[in-house]
Every structure is written in structure tokens, then in C-alpha cells.
A protein has these predicted regions:
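Soluble "head" domains of membrane/secretory-pathway proteins
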Residues: 4-7, 27-193
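Hydrophobic membrane-insertion alpha-helices, especially the h-region
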Residues: 8-26
Length: 193
């Protein structure tokens, strides 16, 4: 057998094996988070629920609205398979149906201000950012079958419900938990040195 052909054959089988492994991992609910809203790493879909609660960490598709389209065009979020043409996001549920949200200088839920959640009106390139409002109001009650999400990991820089609004629960893929975080791998490598 020609040595060049043999190398191509091995490479082909390696590609098939890599694709098969990736597909198997994906269908079993494992997802790679590369954003900075939550620590980069591997997460797994833990549970799909009928009702989500505050503090649930969820994987979801953001709403298909102008705020999300603008964020995609500006490169805040990546293109993907959601109806909004974005990749799914990982965020924490901060408010659920019936909770009162106020978006003024910061995010407040039921009159309790969330730490470090300053609402920005310009991005780093001085382009306008418009906070979400429901029917023109910056104080609203989370509608039925929707949740309000944010990131406590990076609260001041997160593109979340303060800009794109509540997320319909049918956009939620499920709760997630971390399996392997990049910081954990780095700490392990540092410990070996």
C-alpha cells in the first residue's frame, strides 16, 4: 500500500472517530460554553422542567427580537441554530412569573437590587445600548411562562434579560451543571508543575 494513501486512510478514520465522538457527546446533553458570562468549560443538560425556579442555571435560546439581532450583528453573541440565529446561552434565572422587575440604573427584582448589575447605555465602542422595556415601561411583572435571566458570574458585562427581555420557557433546553471548567483544568496543570 502506498504510504501516502495509508496516511490519508488513517486521517479519514480519525476524522470519522472524532465526528462520532462529538455527535455522541452532543446527543447526551454535553455542551461547550466559550462565553465569559459563565466560566468557560463543558456543561451538561441536567433536567428539562415544566416550571423553572429562581437560581436555576439554564441553557436557552434568546428571544428572536431586535435587541438580539443587534447583538448578533455587533458580535456580542455568536451565530447558531436558535430561531434568533444565535447559539444557546447559559444564564441564571433571576425572576419568574409574577416577579416584579425594575430596570433603572441596575436590575432590581421584587425591590431587591442585584449586585453589580449596572445597566449600560453604550457598549465599549460607544454604540447605543437600549435596556428592555415592556410596553414602554422599565418596571414590569414577568409574564406567564417566561423567566428573567442574568449572569452573577459576570454581572456588569452580561448580555442578558436587561437588554433582550424575559425568555419564554419553551426556549429553555433545560437546567445545566458544569462538568469540567477551563479554570479547573488550568489549576490541575499548575498543581502538576
Amino acid at each position: 500500500m502506498n504510504p501516502r494513501f495509508k496516511k490519508l486512510k488513517i486521517l479519514g478514520w480519525m476524522m470519522i472517530a472524532l465526528f462520532s465522538l462529538s455527535f455522541t457527546v452532543y446527543i447526551n446533553g454535553y455542551r461547550l460554553n466559550t462565553s465569559t458570562s459563565f466560566p468557560p468549560g463543558i456543561y451538561v443538560i441536567d433536567a428539562v422542567k415544566d416550571v423553572y425556579q429562581t437560581q436555576d442555571l439554564i441553557l436557552f435560546c434568546p428571544p428572536n427580537n431586535n435587541s438580539v439581532k443587534t447583538a448578533l450583528a455587533r458580535g456580542y453573541i455568536s451565530q447558531g441554530r436558535c430561531k434568533s440565529q444565535t447559539t444557546p446561552m447559559i444564564k441564571r434565572v433571576a425572576a419568574i412569573y409574577g416577579d416584579k422587575v425594575t430596570l433603572s440604573d441596575t436590575i432590581s427584582i421584587n425591590n431587591h437590587e442585584l449586585t453589580n448589575t449596572t445597566i449600560k447605555y453604550q457598549d465599549s465602542l460607544k454604540r447605543s445600548l437600549i435596556p428592555f422595556s415592556l410596553n414602554g415601561k422599565s418596571q414590569f411583572t414577568v409574564p406567564y411562562q417566561q423567566v428573567f435571566v442574568y449572569s452573577e458570574h459576570a454581572p456588569s458585562n452580561s448580555f442578558d434579560s436587561r437588554y433582550f427581555g424575559p425568555v419564554p420557557t419553551n426556549n429553555i433546553h433545560g437546567t445545566v451543571k458544569s462538568v469540567l471548567l477551563i479554570a479547573d483544568v488550568q489549576a490541575f496543570i499548575d498543581a502538576l508543575r
